[in-house]
Amino acid sequence: VGSEMCIRDRNKVVKGLAAGGEFPSHMLKGVRLKVQPDDAKWIRYDVIRSFDRPLWNLDAVNKLNTSLSDLATELDMQLFFLQRKYLDYQVNIGNRIIACLQDGRPDAALEAQRISAPKKTFQDLIDDLFSETGKTIIRTENEIRFSQIGEVLSPYQLSSGEKQMLVILLTVLVEDQLPYVLFMDEPEVSLHVDWQQRLIDLILTLNPNVQIILTTHSPAVIMNGWADRVTEVSDITD
């Protein structure tokens, strides 16, 4: 499906902006956007880069913040910041559940379950994906940690493929089922072929309102009914 030209075009959209946020659709130059509704001024987006390269100048990172001492790769750094977003997400849904239960409506308990359902779905999906290695999320902790045969593991102790899948699904979870555009650059890197095949469906399970724009060299990523959504780079470049 190609990569280089698509990513270059994508960079026109997100150049100079931090990953994850909003940008004004009417201020972009050289990129034509079609938005819905037509008068939309802002677009929420996330960008996921999948390569697990060593952190540049690791000593400087550790001196900057001692809590970063466990981080060795770019995926570790992404997970560190996603953990912070995950804590905020849990506070947010907790406050919504409390407000719902205090409202006194007869369906308050069902609504509270609906609010908390995406988090449980995320945990169930991760447990299923990691089941072959016996890892399960510890659901009593606020930060994401895993249990494996009685040992507690941090996300930074996962394999590259496990970290990558966790980054993707955690990014989608904290979008809180809001409309987002999710850019992904070769998400199949380090992922087992079965995970590649399930990836898009897993993302849409957590956020049905996300629009996915990705580049890939793997047929498995689009094998599950997405072949008709593929654009060849050669068809859109000179």
Please give the residue ranges for each predicted region.
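Non-catalytic, alpha-helical, charged scaffold/linker segments
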Residues: 8-99
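Switch/communication elements of ASCE P-loop NTPase nucleotide-binding domains
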Residues: 124, 133, 138-238
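Hydrophobic, Leu/Ile/Phe/Ala-enriched alpha-helical segments that form helix-helix packing faces
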Residues: 17, 31-35, 122-130, 203
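Conserved catalytic motifs of the protein kinase core domain
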Residues: 2, 43, 179
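Short, small-residue-biased leader/transition segments that mark boundaries at the very start
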Residues: 1-7
